[in-house]
Amino acid sequence: ELSIHANVDGRLADFEEGDFWEFVGDDNMPLRLEDGSVLCDPGHALEFVGLAYKFLRAARNAEVDALTLERLSCAAAPLPTILQQIFRLGFQPHPGGICKAYDMVGRRPLHTDMPWWSLPETIRSAALCWQESDDADVRQSCLGIWRDCHNAFVENYLRPEIHLMAIQTLTIEGTVSPAIPATADADPGYHTGLSLLDVIDLFRD
């Protein structure tokens, strides 16, 4: 259930609305590490929003009854808040990228490397949220997230001098990190830019 991994409707007073944590304990509460921190992987959380919207769209296109449609609507309701909150926490505007880990207790980045893949994933999440929402403020926020991720990817990761091949990971200082994240050859079924193909399909619709 989404509310186990996210703070929805103020369920946990110690966390902000839309906070999303990576791990839960046996008590279905956020898992605290030895130092008391609660880990959020902003890239995973933002990726989840896009995949959730993709599932919800597919489910609505199937022949489902009214009760199922109502449940789908309830499931979708927290997604814009999660998108906006996690982007606000994880996106590092200077130089531009999404940090690998964030502490939900200390409210600070835990791992400041910024892998490439979280930016196109967040573009898909913002695009689908923009399409699904009827709220003007949410839609405007989605466009801003979409813009910031696009600009960060094009300006900081793509390298025109070598046929637009992208840097895999940047540090928060804007230098190239030796860390290797998910790559197309190691993960051929997913991390190959498929999220951007969904965005292209959105334009076609």
Which residue stretches match the model-derived regions?
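Glycan-recognition and catalytic cores of secretory/periplasmic carbohydrate-active enzymes
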Residues: 1-205
